[in-house]
């Protein structure tokens, strides 16, 4: 941290904590000296205000920006652009590897300009947690964990060696090795400080812990009162190199919670309820801040579960204020007493402690006593289904999806059972959303214990797995003696990582796959994850339901989505009595008592004392020690990215977009999973052909996520999700389009190759909430490499819009209820963005011209979704990293 040299509001003060002196930028002093009323700001905006006070330099941050936070109070909204500098950056390996590759390529570009390549170095703390690569290859066996770790290192040795090179090559760059946990849970339990301490010119400074992360669920840490959200890897890389995050001061929605959850409900039920409420409200691009007397009834883990799913309810973050529960968690998770004292004193001094005297843009309220057991599905987190309605809801889903009157039934070869539409084939306790919450994990363990003791078993067609986000989870399950019962039901430990939640569910048995394909069975997964988009969990699963860990276990026993868990028996005991869910569901008191006896601070301290060592396989990996990476031309995992090749000294400026062909016309809620899938690679695809050329067998394909260090793979995989539906190619599903004027259906990548030969510009047409989901920068990088110049949609999700600009792609938004349907777009049109080459400004009205095949011409006004002046500079430079690099050389 290097504070700005200005101090317009005379806010730099000193505080004494435990007889130690610290400097800090006082919000109280700033209020006295010109920022009247700011004590009533939402706590999250106070964090932004402190950041501006600390970095005021009259260049990137000036007095007007600071004053604009005060002005926000007048209308509770603002169009002012501010420059925000988070304290640190959090990466995971799927996004971290391309980030390190970009930094390595930038070093080469600097060297080629005869400058010092070591100027490319992170200026803020960067932590990369390797959690996305482990797959559920083995499950339901005592040695599943060991086998999966071995396979993980066999597949990813080259990638991990590259990351080890990055750790020694770059400053301020730490790696948490594989097999440790999920980045957000490690962040919550270990990395976060709530209040950051840093030395500058001999003085120690205190300031709020803040971060951005290259994973959309970075928001989880807001449950610990650490302001953070997901950004694309390209924006994170720019932030590492000192570029502030350009943002508009957000609206803040106050979410009041009252009362407490009733007996028999979980934090998962609560968060799925919150997701539905806030999606209906509409909070995209806004902060949500929780307050109210109900906060005292939410544990820190409950808050983290709610904060985790901010991307699912559309908000930039879901922030919780500092209070006694925050301090309790810090102590409980092994933080030292002085750290806890700093947090308490600083929060109370700065007005960051929980209070009720807050002015919000708007408010919404939830009486938590009304929460009931809930699941969400079949394909969106906001598709809330009350557990009581689950069987009838699924029947309706099945009827709409298949038009079948009767179930497809398929015999599974070499077994004595059959599967049918609605059979649950995957049941996974997975994801940081829930495995960070001891109450629901203990709940699942107690339910398993009762089920086993009563003689219940999981159905044989269900693939079961347990993948916690932290090693502490297995410690307390073992101490409670519950791991034995989970193991007996097939929920053996398979790894510490994201696994099924991100699509790394591993293969289903061949005889199960054959049975699905033989009768086109509409198969189901149930997982304790945060996303259930189409095609995400497994290529063979059509419907995915999110549920609490105890319900995941219950559904694995039930085996079918049409089982009514309230009315239908799950099985019989030894005396032939029916057993129902209510007979095995643990009480809140049972959970609390077990938790008190099995979880303590020493577990956190011990597990994180040697967090950087990693397993023996990690320790054995060798890497070169150098500042410039030696690229292996034959590698199919890590290639030098092309984004900085032949970089001109001057910005590219505004480029003409004329007579562009639509490459895809897409509907609503197209996710970044649709645009750039993370999971399975199909043999019959352009990527499969590429692998065939490089003599790579299907068993060694790994996943798209693991190949993000290779642009050749990723550009072929862009828009290759098996469930994407391009309206230009009706009757197809997957990565296909129709090329014009021939009207020939081709794979997306093959069509791009053909259009490139012709010198044809390309655009993508979208519906509402284009780019929702993961903060996947490859969804923008791949779009760029395909030659797409603009994306024209009805609305954009926050992170993807930013990523498009960060790659030099123009986002345009339809206005006045105009859309692809009432424009009658089919893909045969030629589209021009008029006068863009003459220059545009943020939020300009931009006219597009549509030439129809009939000869008709229509002009349509759109909104330029370049929102800030900084974003405009990024666009003119062809991307944010190109902008940063030009400024450095």
Residue ranges and their predicted role:
Residues 1-889:
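Fe-S-dependent hydro-lyases/dehydratases of central metabolism
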């Amino acid at each position: 941290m290097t504070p700005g040299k200005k101090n317009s509001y005379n806010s730099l003060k000193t505080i004494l904590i435990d007889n130690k002196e610290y400097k800090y930028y006082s919000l109280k002093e700033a209020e006295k000296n010109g920022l009247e009323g700011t004590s009533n700001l939402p706590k999250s905006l106070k964090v932004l205000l402190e950041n501006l006070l600390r970095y005021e330099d009259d260049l990137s941050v000036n007095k007007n920006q600071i004053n604009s936070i005060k002005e926000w109070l007048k209308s509770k909204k603002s169009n002012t652009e501010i420059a925000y500098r988070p304290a640190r950056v959090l990466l995971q390996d799927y996004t971290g590897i391309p980030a390190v590759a970009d930094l390595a390529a930038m070093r080469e570009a600097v060297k080629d300009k005869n400058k010092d390549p070591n100027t490319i170095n992170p200026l803020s703390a960067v932590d990369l947690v390797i959690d996305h690569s482990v797959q559920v290859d083995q499950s339901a066996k005592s040695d599943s964990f060991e086998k999966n770790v071995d396979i993980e290192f066999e597949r990813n040795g080259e990638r991990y060696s590259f990351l080890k090179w990055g750790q020694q090559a770059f400053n301020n760059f730490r790696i948490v090795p594989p097999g440790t946990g999920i980045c957000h849970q490690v962040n919550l339990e270990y990395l976060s400080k709530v209040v950051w301490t840093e030395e500058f010119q001999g003085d120690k400074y205190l300031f709020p812990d803040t971060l951005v992360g290259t994973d959309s669920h970075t928001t989880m840490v807001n449950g610990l009162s650490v302001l953070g959200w997901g950004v694309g890897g390209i924006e994170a890389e720019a932030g590492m190199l000192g570029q502030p995050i350009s943002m508009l001061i957000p609206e803040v929605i106050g979410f009041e919670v009252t009362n407490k959850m009733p007996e028999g409900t979980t934090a998962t039920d609560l968060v799925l309820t919150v997701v539905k409420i806030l999606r209906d409200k509409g909070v995209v691009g806004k902060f949500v801040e929780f307050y109210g007397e109900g906060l005292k009834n939410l544990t820190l883990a409950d808050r983290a579960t709610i904060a985790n799913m901010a991307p699912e309810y559309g908000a930039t973050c879901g922030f919780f204020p500092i209070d006694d529960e925050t301090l309790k968690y810090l102590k409980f998770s092994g933080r030292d007493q002085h750290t806890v004292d700093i947090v308490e004193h600083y929060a109370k001094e700065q007005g960051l402690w929980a209070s009720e005297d807050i002015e919000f843009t708007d408010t919404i309220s939830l009486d938590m006593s009304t929460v009931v057991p809930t699941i969400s599905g079949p394909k969106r987190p906001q598709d809330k289904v009350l557990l009581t309605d689950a069987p009838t809801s699924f029947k309706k889903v099945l009827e709409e999806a298949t038009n079948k009157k009767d179930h497809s039934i398929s015999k599974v070869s070499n077994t004595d059972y059959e599967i049918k539409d609605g059979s649950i084939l995957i049941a996974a306790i997975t994801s940081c959303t829930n495995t960070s919450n001891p109450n629901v994990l203990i709940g699942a363990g107690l339910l398993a214990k009762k089920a086993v003791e009563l003689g219940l078993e999981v159905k044989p067609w269900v693939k079961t797995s347990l993948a916690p986000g932290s090693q502490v989870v297995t410690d307390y399950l073992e101490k409670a003696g519950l791991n034995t019962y989970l193991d007996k039901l097939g929920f053996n430990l398979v790894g510490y990582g994201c696994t099924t939640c991100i699509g790394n569910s591993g293969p289903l048995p061949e005889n199960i796959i054959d049975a699905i394909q033989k009768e086109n069975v509409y198969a189901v997964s149930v997982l304790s994850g945060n996303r259930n988009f189409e095609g995400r969990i497994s290529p063979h699963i059509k419907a995915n339901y999110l549920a609490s860990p105890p319900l995941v276990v219950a559904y694995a026993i039930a085996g079918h989505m049409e089982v009514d868990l309230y009315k239908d028996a799950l099985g019989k005991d030894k005396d032939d009595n029916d057993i129902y869910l209510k007979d095995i569901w643990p009480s809140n008191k049972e959970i609390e008592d077990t938790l008190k006896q099995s979880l303590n601070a020493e577990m956190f301290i011990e597990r994180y004392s040697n967090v950087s060592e990693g397993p023996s396989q990690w320790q054995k990996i060798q890497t070169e020690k150098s500042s410039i990476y030696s690229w292996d031309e034959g590698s199919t995992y890590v290639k030098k990215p092309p984004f900085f090749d032949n970089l001109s000294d001057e910005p590219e400026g505004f480029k003409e977009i004329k007579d562009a062909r639509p490459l895809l016309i897409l509907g609503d809620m197209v996710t970044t999973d649709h645009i750039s899938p993370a999971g399975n690679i199909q043999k019959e695809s352009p990527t499969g052909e590429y692998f065939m050329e490089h003599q790579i067998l299907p068993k060694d394909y790994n996943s798209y996520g693991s190949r993000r260090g290779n642009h050749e793979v990723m550009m072929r995989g862009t828009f290759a999700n098996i469930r994407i539906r391009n309206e230009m190619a009706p009757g197809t599903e997957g990565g296909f389009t129709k090329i014009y004027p021939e009207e020939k259906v081709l794979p997306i990548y093959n069509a791009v190759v053909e259009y490139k030969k012709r010198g044809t510009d390309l655009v993508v047409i979208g519906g509402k909430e284009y780019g929702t989901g993961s903060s996947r920068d490859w969804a923008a990088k791949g779009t760029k490499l395909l030659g797409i110049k603009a994306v024209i949609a009805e609305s954009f999700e926050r992170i993807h819009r930013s990523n498009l600009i960060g790659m030099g792609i123009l986002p345009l938004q339809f206005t006045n209820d105009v859309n692809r349907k009432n424009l009658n777009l089919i893909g045969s049109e030629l589209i021009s963005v008029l006068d863009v080459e003459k220059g545009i400004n943020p939020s300009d009205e931009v006219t597009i011209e549509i030439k129809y095949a009939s000869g008709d011409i229509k002009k349509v006004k759109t909104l330029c979704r370049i929102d800030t002046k900084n974003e405009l500079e990024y666009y003119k430079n062809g991307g944010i990293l190109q902008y940063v690099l030009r400024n450095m050389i």
